Protein backbone atom coordinates (compact mmCIF):
# COMPACT_ATOMS: atom_id res chain seq x y z
CA UNK A 1 0.00 0.00 0.00
CA UNK A 2 1.18 3.50 -0.69
CA UNK A 3 0.42 7.04 0.48
CA UNK A 4 1.85 9.96 -1.53
CA UNK A 5 1.56 13.61 -0.60
CA UNK A 6 3.26 16.94 -1.45
CA UNK A 7 3.22 20.36 0.16
CA UNK A 8 4.87 23.71 -0.60
CA UNK A 9 6.91 25.12 2.29
CA UNK A 10 8.22 28.70 2.41
CA UNK A 11 11.72 27.69 3.53
CA UNK A 12 14.82 26.48 1.69
CA UNK A 13 15.48 22.72 1.45
CA UNK A 14 18.44 22.93 3.89
CA UNK A 15 16.21 24.35 6.64
CA UNK A 16 13.47 21.77 6.04
CA UNK A 17 16.06 18.97 5.95
CA UNK A 18 17.47 20.04 9.34
CA UNK A 19 14.02 19.73 10.92
CA UNK A 20 12.90 16.45 9.33
CA UNK A 21 16.23 14.74 10.08
CA UNK A 22 16.40 15.78 13.76
CA UNK A 23 14.72 13.04 15.83
CA UNK A 24 14.22 15.41 18.77
CA UNK A 25 11.88 17.48 16.59
CA UNK A 26 9.58 14.64 15.47
CA UNK A 27 6.98 15.54 18.09
CA UNK A 28 6.69 19.04 16.63
CA UNK A 29 5.36 17.87 13.28
CA UNK A 30 4.65 14.12 13.04
CA UNK A 31 1.06 13.65 14.21
CA UNK A 32 1.40 9.91 14.91
CA UNK A 33 4.64 10.33 16.91
CA UNK A 34 4.24 9.35 20.56
CA UNK A 35 7.87 9.22 21.76
CA UNK A 36 11.43 8.29 20.92
CA UNK A 37 12.63 4.97 22.28
CA UNK A 38 16.21 5.68 21.21
CA UNK A 39 17.96 7.83 18.62
CA UNK A 40 21.35 9.37 17.96
CA UNK A 41 21.82 13.05 18.81
CA UNK A 42 21.58 15.71 16.13
CA UNK A 43 20.78 15.49 12.45
CA UNK A 44 20.58 11.89 11.26
CA UNK A 45 22.90 10.53 8.58
CA UNK A 46 22.78 7.55 6.25
CA UNK A 47 23.05 4.31 8.25
CA UNK A 48 21.70 5.81 11.49
CA UNK A 49 18.90 3.99 13.30
CA UNK A 50 16.17 5.16 15.63
CA UNK A 51 13.27 3.52 17.42
CA UNK A 52 10.05 5.46 17.66
CA UNK A 53 6.76 4.80 19.42
CA UNK A 54 3.82 5.62 17.16
CA UNK A 55 0.15 6.01 17.99
CA UNK A 56 -2.32 5.32 15.18
CA UNK A 57 -6.06 4.87 15.73
CA UNK A 58 -5.56 4.70 19.52
CA UNK A 59 -3.00 1.87 19.19
CA UNK A 60 0.65 2.32 20.23
CA UNK A 61 3.52 0.35 18.74
CA UNK A 62 7.25 0.70 18.20
CA UNK A 63 8.94 1.05 14.81
CA UNK A 64 12.67 0.76 14.22
CA UNK A 65 13.82 2.99 11.36
CA UNK A 66 17.11 2.95 9.49
CA UNK A 67 18.17 5.86 7.32
CA UNK A 68 18.82 4.02 4.05
CA UNK A 69 19.54 7.18 2.01
CA UNK A 70 20.45 10.67 3.21
CA UNK A 71 21.53 13.04 0.44
CA UNK A 72 21.46 16.47 2.01
CA UNK A 73 19.41 18.56 1.33
CA UNK A 74 17.42 16.66 -1.26
CA UNK A 75 16.62 12.98 -0.68
CA UNK A 76 15.90 10.79 2.34
CA UNK A 77 14.73 7.18 2.50
CA UNK A 78 13.79 5.33 5.67
CA UNK A 79 13.32 1.58 6.06
CA UNK A 80 11.07 0.59 8.95
CA UNK A 81 10.47 -2.63 10.84
CA UNK A 82 7.17 -2.80 12.65
CA UNK A 83 5.34 -5.37 14.79
CA UNK A 84 4.07 -8.62 13.24
CA UNK A 85 6.45 -8.45 10.29
CA UNK A 86 5.10 -5.23 8.82
CA UNK A 87 7.67 -3.35 6.75
CA UNK A 88 7.59 0.29 5.74
CA UNK A 89 9.59 2.47 3.39
CA UNK A 90 9.26 6.24 3.63
CA UNK A 91 10.90 8.74 1.31
CA UNK A 92 11.24 12.51 1.35
CA UNK A 93 12.15 14.48 -1.78
CA UNK A 94 12.88 18.10 -0.95
CA UNK A 95 12.54 19.85 -4.29
CA UNK A 96 13.78 23.46 -4.49
CA UNK A 97 10.98 25.83 -5.61
CA UNK A 98 12.10 29.44 -5.86
CA UNK A 99 12.96 30.44 -2.27
CA UNK A 100 11.03 27.49 -0.86
CA UNK A 101 10.68 23.72 -0.97
CA UNK A 102 8.19 21.30 -2.43
CA UNK A 103 8.22 18.50 0.15
CA UNK A 104 7.24 15.22 -1.52
CA UNK A 105 6.36 12.39 0.88
CA UNK A 106 5.84 8.71 0.01
CA UNK A 107 5.00 5.98 2.55
CA UNK A 108 4.92 2.41 1.25
CA UNK A 109 4.10 -0.44 3.60
CA UNK A 110 3.24 -4.12 3.60
CA UNK A 111 0.72 -5.30 6.17
CA UNK A 112 0.79 -8.91 7.40
CA UNK A 113 -2.18 -11.25 7.20
CA UNK A 114 -2.64 -12.01 3.51
CA UNK A 115 -6.17 -11.25 2.17
CA UNK A 116 -7.46 -10.38 5.64
CA UNK A 117 -4.62 -7.90 6.07
CA UNK A 118 -5.58 -6.30 2.77
CA UNK A 119 -9.17 -5.79 3.93
CA UNK A 120 -8.03 -4.10 7.14
CA UNK A 121 -5.34 -2.36 5.14
CA UNK A 122 -7.88 -0.19 3.30
CA UNK A 123 -9.02 1.34 6.59
CA UNK A 124 -5.41 1.72 7.70
CA UNK A 125 -4.55 3.41 4.40
CA UNK A 126 -7.32 5.99 4.89
CA UNK A 127 -6.00 6.74 8.38
CA UNK A 128 -2.41 6.92 7.11
CA UNK A 129 -3.41 9.33 4.34
CA UNK A 130 -5.30 11.59 6.76
CA UNK A 131 -2.36 11.64 9.19
CA UNK A 132 0.10 12.33 6.35
CA UNK A 133 -1.96 15.39 5.39
CA UNK A 134 -2.08 16.63 8.99
CA UNK A 135 1.65 15.96 9.46
CA UNK A 136 2.67 17.94 6.39
CA UNK A 137 0.47 20.88 7.42
CA UNK A 138 2.20 20.87 10.83
CA UNK A 139 5.63 20.75 9.16
CA UNK A 140 4.70 23.70 6.95
CA UNK A 141 3.46 25.56 10.04
CA UNK A 142 6.89 25.33 11.67
CA UNK A 143 8.22 27.60 8.92
CA UNK A 144 5.21 29.78 8.14
CA UNK A 145 4.03 31.22 11.44
Predicted segments, located by residue:
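Hydrophobic ligand-binding cavity/cleft-lining segments
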Residues: 1-45
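Short, surface-exposed coil-to-beta transition loops
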Residues: 2-4, 60-64, 86-91
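Glycine-rich portal/gate segments that line the openings of hydrophobic small-molecule binding cavities
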Residues: 37-83, 97, 102, 134-145
